[in-house]
């Protein structure tokens, strides 16, 4: 066992007390990204090593692996703690997204080590989708590169507001303050093009030598700021989901017996309490919350992020993919939306194609009406294209087979994030972030009932040879 972990358990008074203490620590999810060979895996290995999160057998194995696959001569190659795939060790690069967990006395952490190569952009986007902070590594010898800009853009596109720019390999530039200042100014000039109100920090460090990672560097007396670990431990993440409107996507209808009917899922945002009036979309039927059932028993009130089962006072028709929200909120269903897409398939995305999509437990079909532009993520310019290639990022117009209830991704990632699924292979081929829902269903709802709209979508989906027109716009 890790001796530090054993000491912590002893100090807490046993395993059970230690586990309870861990549960009450805040959790920070962050990723490391940057250009190839900037030292991302080495940095994570250094964090694990200096916070004493490595077990004795892992340390022994690391000594042996460093001799066979290491790139640091006689020193320990800490990157091998993270690069687990054989291909990664042989090439000395990161390919897959590697997740690691560690904790300190102040906070728990989940790290996503993402690849730096451009052909693995889809892997990087996958890792960033669940993170709240991004560490952007920059090689002090090379400065801000195109891949640095690319990863910065993807991180902000996926809703990350906290960026830590770690200027690595300071030992190779003699710990020069001038180099640090120049790179800092270059990045701030570029960051002015990034969307959103960002919190950007800068830390000069050497992942290989451990300078300013978990302890203050004696080689850089000119830097008086926080170490990287101190930044991670103290950064305040604004989790605003509790203050947002209630969103409860139904994942499962729970019917264990004739006397119980509950709707299970995770509360995506807001809060819900017993007695609250709620509305079911897209049907619009209203009811009251009779019970809130959790693993620990019934609760009177729950908040965003909790897995719950809601029991309503009325027996109404609710199925997987329906959305519950506060009854007094007006959220119209939409038939179309503009979506920021990260394409992940060899076959490019082209106008006219149809895909199955999945969003907040709801599975339906969407057609690509057009591609407005592709983003050149090396310089953040937009260009017109006929299709979106592998690893391409662009703004795409979609039309759905049925009205959906959507939020902008920046407002709610659960009800604003979707995936594209190939209808033949059932493989996930793309990820989408709702840029702007296009309210068309509202205008048509006065002319057609919800049943007529659903029947129309059903006929067009299964009997296209009938030539039925789209009631929401004859598309």
From Swiss-Prot:
Residues 25-239 form the tr-type G domain. Residues 34-41 are annotated as: G1. Residues 168-171 are annotated as: G4. Pathway: Sulfur metabolism; hydrogen sulfide biosynthesis; sulfite from sulfate: step 1/3. It catalyses: sulfate + ATP + H(+) = adenosine 5'-phosphosulfate + diphosphate. NCBIfam families: CysN (TIGR02034), PRK05124.1 (NF003478), small_GTP (TIGR00231). This is Sulfate adenylyltransferase subunit 1. The gene is cysN.
């Amino acid at each position: 066992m890790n001796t530090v972990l054993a000491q912590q358990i002893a100090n807490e008074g046993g395993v059970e007390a230690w586990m309870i203490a861990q549960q009450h620590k805040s959790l920070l999810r962050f990723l490391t990204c940057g250009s190839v060979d900037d030292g991302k895996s080495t940095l994570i290995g250094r964090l694990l090593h200096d916070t004493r999160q490595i077990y004795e057998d892992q340390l022994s194995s690391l000594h042996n692996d460093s001799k066979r696959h290491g790139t640091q001569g006689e020193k320990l190659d800490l990157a091998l703690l993270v690069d687990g795939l054989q291909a990664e060790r042989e090439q000395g690069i990161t390919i897959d997204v590697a997740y690691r967990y560690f904790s300190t006395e102040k906070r728990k952490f989940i790290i996503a080590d993402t690849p730096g190569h451009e052909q693995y952009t889809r892997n990087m986007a996958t890792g960033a989708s669940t993170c709240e902070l991004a560490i952007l590594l920059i090689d002090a010898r090379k400065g801000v590169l195109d891949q640095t800009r690319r990863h910065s853009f993807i991180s902000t596109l996926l809703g990350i507001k906290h960026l830590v720019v770690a200027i690595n390999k300071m030992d190779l530039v003699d710990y020069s303050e001038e180099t640090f200042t120049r790179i800092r100014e270059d990045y701030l000039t570029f960051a002015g093009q990034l969307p959103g109100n960002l919190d950007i920090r800068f830390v000069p460090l050497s992942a290989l030598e451990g300078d300013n990672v978990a302890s203050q560097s004696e080689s850089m007396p000119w830097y008086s700021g926080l170490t990287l670990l101190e930044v991670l431990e103290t950064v305040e993440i604004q989790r605003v989901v509790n203050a947002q409107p209630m969103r409860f996507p139904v994942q499962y209808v729970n019917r264990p017996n004739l006397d119980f009917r509950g709707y299970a899922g995770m509360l995506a945002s807001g809060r819900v309490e017993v007695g609250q009036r709620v509305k079911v979309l897209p049907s619009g039927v209203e009811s009251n919350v009779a019970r809130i059932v959790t693993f620990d028993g019934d609760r009177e009130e729950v908040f965003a992020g909790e897995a719950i089962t809601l029991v309503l006072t009325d027996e109404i028709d609710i199925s997987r993919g329906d959305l519950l929200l506060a009854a007094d909120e007006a959220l119209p269903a939409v038939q179309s939306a503009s979506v920021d897409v990260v394409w992940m398939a060899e076959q490019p995305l082209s106008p006219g194609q149809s895909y199955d999509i999945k969003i907040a437990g709801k599975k339906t079909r969407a057609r690509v009406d057009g591609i407005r532009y592709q983003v050149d993520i090396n310089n953040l310019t937009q260009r017109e294209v006929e299709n979106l290639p592998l690893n391409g990022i662009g703004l795409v117009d979609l039309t759905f087979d049925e009205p959906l209830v959507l939020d902008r991704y920046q407002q709610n990632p659960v009800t604003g994030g979707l995936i594209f699924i190939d209808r033949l292979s059932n493989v996930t081929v793309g990820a989408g972030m709702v840029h702007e829902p296009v309210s068309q269903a509202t205008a048509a709802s006065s002319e057609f009932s919800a049943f007529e709209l659903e029947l129309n979508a059903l006929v067009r989906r299964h009997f296209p040879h009938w030539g039925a027109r789209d009631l929401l716009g004859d598309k």
